[in-house]
Amino acid sequence: MSTTIAVNGNHYQQLHQGRTSMYKSKVDVVLGAQWGDEGKGKVVDMLASEVDIVCRCQGGNNAGHTVVANGTEFDFHLLPSGVVNEKCISVIGNGVVIHLPSLFDEVLKNEAKGLQHLENRLIISDRAHLVFDFHQHVDGMQEAEKGGKSLGTTKKGIGPAYSSKATRNGIRVGELLGDFNLFSEKFKSIVNTHLRLFPSIKVDVDAELARYKDYVDKVRPYVKDTICFLHTALRNGKTILVEGANAAMLDIDFGTYPYVTSSNCSIGGVLTGLGLPPQTIGEVIGVVKAYTTRVGDGPFPTEQLNEIGDLLQTRGFEVGVTTKRKRRCGWLDIPLLKYTSLVNGYTCICITKLDILDTLPEIKVGVSYKRSSGDKLDHFPGTISELSDIEVEYAVLPGWQTSTEHIRNFKELPENAQNYVRFLESQLSVPVRWVGVGKGRESIINVH
């Protein structure tokens, strides 16, 4: 019996070694650890200067990333933030849903700010699904029908496009570049499906088909089989960075459902959205804002509907890049971060916008949840009703009341600011590798 166990053990070890040795490099991932707007784009921009390829794996132009490079502020919605690095290839993966008019509008706006030669360094998956204008109309109608129970959607058509994908009548980029007659038939079919469900929407089919025929030659230079491209890159030792859109608490499975987006914006979405196996994943970087914000509706346990919330909103310029709506603000939430770390397996943390807390005499941190009955929770609530019934217990930490904006060395931060970082680190049992104290990439401090 002992011989059998040893043989099986060797087989297992050989299998494991065989699978991992196929690739000469790993894929590092940057994920939002809260409800979005954590500053992922800035972290990606910082790391993109050291990698060969940057990828988007899910979501659409409902995401918003702001990057400041060489004094110029770029706003990205579909383009990966890594496009500011001219030596880097940017990939829009199969899990992304693409509204072509918005994509090319975004390209033009950023070219006007100095972003050049994208045709040489942007690749779009032929398997990515298309978002059409009628998807956006339906999105707005569905939100309006909910009345006071709206989900806070961006009305960019993301949910309806993923619905089309799930019901197997969506249209992919590769189909646009194939036989246009077949594309036209599929387009008419999907329009008719939506008209049966939403008779009031207006779609000029001929005009839309003419518009998309114009897009064929425009988009063709960018389109490739990204799955093959990425696996070849890994076998050749190329370094790859993935920029997650949205954030863990907006994940369709793990977020505060139904106040979520329509894709998997946790680590699982990276694998399915790019066609990567689990053993290719290296570092998983959780980006954590030094306080908590949320755009739109839904539960928010540590929200501060008072002067603290107003101060955070004002000092942090908390306005959505995509929606232009004011973000709701509150204290840092440790139970929430423990939960998203559980799901994503963060190997390190980047804390952003620490400088926004500079003026506060004391800072609260939510450290545990308890029910109204007084019982402490040992898990993150899975339903809205349960989450609405909890009370947050806070730790109170002393503030530092001095500017950190121009500090570039962790040991030069005020002692209480360092203690705030170390407190988060100890609570999550995940090392904090970077701390951000400003807008540009130069404001990110290396902790270790």
Swiss-Prot record:
Q: Name one GO molecular function term.
A: GTP binding
Name the enzyme's class. Answer: ligase
Cofactor needs:
Mg(2+)
State the reactions this protein catalyses: IMP + L-aspartate + GTP = N(6)-(1,2-dicarboxyethyl)-AMP + GDP + phosphate + 2 H(+)
Stored Pfam families? Adenylsucc_synt
Please give the PROSITE patterns that the UniProt record associates with this protein: ADENYLOSUCCIN_SYN_1, ADENYLOSUCCIN_SYN_2
Amino acids binding substrate = 321-327
The answer to whether keyword Transcription regulation applies is no
**In the UniProt record, does the keyword Cell division occur?**
no
| The entry's keywords | Cytoplasm, GTP-binding, Ligase, Magnesium, Metal-binding, Nucleotide-binding, Purine biosynthesis
Identify the residues that bind IMP: 37-40, 62-65, 154, 168, 246, 261, 325
- Intracellular or extracellular location(s): Cytoplasm
Q: Where does Mg(2+) bind?
A: 37, 64
Residue positions annotated to bind GTP are 36-42, 64-66, 327, 353-355, 436-438
- Catalytic residue list: 37, 65
**Role noted for this protein:** Plays an important role in the de novo pathway and in the salvage pathway of purine nucleotide biosynthesis. Catalyzes the first committed step in the biosynthesis of AMP from IMP.
Q: What is said about its interaction partners and assembly?
A: Homodimer.
The protein depicted here goes by the name Adenylosuccinate synthetase
- Source organism of this protein record: Drosophila virilis (Fruit fly)
